[in-house]
């Protein structure tokens, strides 16, 4: 599990404070390195898939690590934290007024121009 996953203690859970998408992406890249080094994974055939927060991470991976993931699927992802649940987001990123750059750095929409590879985005009206 990447940083911020439940069940590993407070430090692990809060490692993404004011930097959603960055520590987790490093964990994904470390996982790829491990699989290539120890389990004959083919680095040229790595993809990423996820829903909800996993969909957000799929977008961050495709946009902020171009070339690392050849394909991705993001189901019901958050694309801009400024437009998500304030109660949830403000506990992790503060508020857009207090940390506008934090919101920019943590929102996939701000990094979309770096996309390489193939990406499927599927979203309905709500994330349940």
Question: What are the functions of these language-model segments?
Answer:
Residues 2-128:
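Active-site-proximal cap/loop segments of hydrolase catalytic domains
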